Amino acid sequence: MQYDAVRLGIGLYGISPMGGDATLRPISTLKTIILQIHDVPADETVGYSRKGLLQRPSRIAALPIGYADGLNRHLGNRRGYCIINGKQAPYVGNICMDVCMVDVTDIECREGDSVEIFGPNLSVETVAAWLDTIPYEVLTAVSTRIKRVYYSD
């Protein structure tokens, strides 16, 4: 027998396959930008099938990422959020193929600002838990349409 090989699996990406703190540092971030911001009155709807009913006058930001890019449709309708300028921005309405909408009513932001889908402020494990799945699925769902940028220390 030979014992000189290791299968790193998801550990290569800084995520423990067993959960918990394994002193691994996650290495991946999925980001986009705010494409547009619109003020939308209360009782209006947002997204496919008009599922996102707004309870109050809201500022809604459109993000150029959708389920064709790997953003899971089940995150829509406030079941998940992204991070904008350090604040949680809930997804409103259904996640569309190429775009999604988030509520930025209480967030100071503007078009062009960076949006973290997952990364240092929102872990892949957290997103996976919202979806009742495993981190592998969240990471491998990211489409080849998404530009990859690699950094070296």
Residue ranges of model-derived segments:
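Active-site anion/phosphate-binding pocket segments in diverse small-molecule metabolic enzymes
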Residues: 1-153
